[in-house]
Amino acid sequence: MTASPAMRSVADVVAGLGSAAVRPSVGVAVDQLGRPGSRHRIPTPALVVDADALAANIDAAQRGADMAGVRLRPHAKTHKSAAVARLQLDAGASGVCVAKVGEAEALAGAGIDDLLVTSPIRPHLVERVADLRAAGVAVAVVADHPDVVPALAGAASTGAPLDVLVDVDVGLHRTGVAEARDSAALAELIAAQPDLRFRGVQGYGGHWQHVADPAERADAVAAGMRRLVECIRAIEGTGLTIDRCSGGGTGTFAVDCELGVLNELQPGSYAFMDQQYADALDGDAAPWRQALFVQATVVSANHDGFVTVDAGLKAFATDAGHPGASPSTYRWFGDEHGLVTQPPDHELRLGDRLELVPPHCDPTVDRYDVLHVVRDDVLVDVVPIEARGCSQ
């Protein structure tokens, strides 16, 4: 991972210690950068990214999108890092997605300037969208209810029209317009505002991403896309044009490419991957590689059959089971600790390092300040997670 104008190097990280972006408690081992074996001398628990696996994942997704003739707009809610976003953009991504306005602000502040906010914008946040646009950031938003349209129009009144997509409920029932006629009415309302520009639709099925059986997953996506197509036809029936049809995810990436309904794909987890995807996709996880780990240290080894490590409930998101520790197993052992069984082929001892696979990558990343980037056994860079905690 090499530095670019929009990417802070480890020197920048160290200079920023004590700032809002990087906290003094990070414990960055600056003197270890580039040294043989430095991967195993990072203060733990720490978030570690395998540079080669990350690069392979980014390349595979971009090649897949290019072969399908669709745009790739990766979701930065996974990595929350301008450095990783820059790698994705350099590989050919058309822009990046963010979940919240706060994430857009953080990444825009680090030089990422083409953003789609994929969660409906609450009226009290539209002024912050206006501020981003005033700063020259190309930001688009989604809407799923007519009541928010006047606020969006008001925020856009001082500049070029704000791009808006209609968010369609394709079966998740979390956000989105449920009925085709309502999607058409909302699109017409958006298009009628001089300060807004209707650009298309978004349809995301998060509930499909971890369906284990490939055939069942494909059938579920196809059914959801039929709902999206119904909305598209209803909107086009009003005379409006659909420029962007955005959605998709990591678990459905291949199906999304094959179906051809979406012309802009939003996978996020593919960059890092996690144990939840490994368990759900099993052999169907290709071409993605595990790139994200939480490195932990054995801090107690006084009992037969297991050791205690310094990564517990605070080190991982806990919504998706236990971290992966193959060939050992991991169990929660408190806020600060985890229990790891002794592996069958060797004995873990006090001070040994382990790299554990997070159960769920997105919220695990949100618990850390920096990514420790490694290649083989060398720590090659440390970059900030600018959008950590930006949940508004």
Spans of features found by a protein language model:
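Conserved, mostly hydrophobic/aromatic
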Residues: 54, 77, 107, 166, ...
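C-terminal accessory subdomain/extension
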Residues: 2-3, 302-392
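Active-site loop ensemble at the mouth of alpha/beta enzyme cores that anchors a bound cofactor
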Residues: 217-219, 251-326
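Active-site loop/helix belt of alpha/beta enzymes
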Residues: 163, 169-282
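Glycine-rich tight-turn/loop motif centered on a GG-T
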Residues: 39-51, 113-115, 130-141, 212-222, ...
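A charged N-terminal "starter" segment
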Residues: 1-131, 388-392
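Active-site-proximal beta-alpha core segment in soluble small-molecule metabolic enzymes
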Residues: 74-209
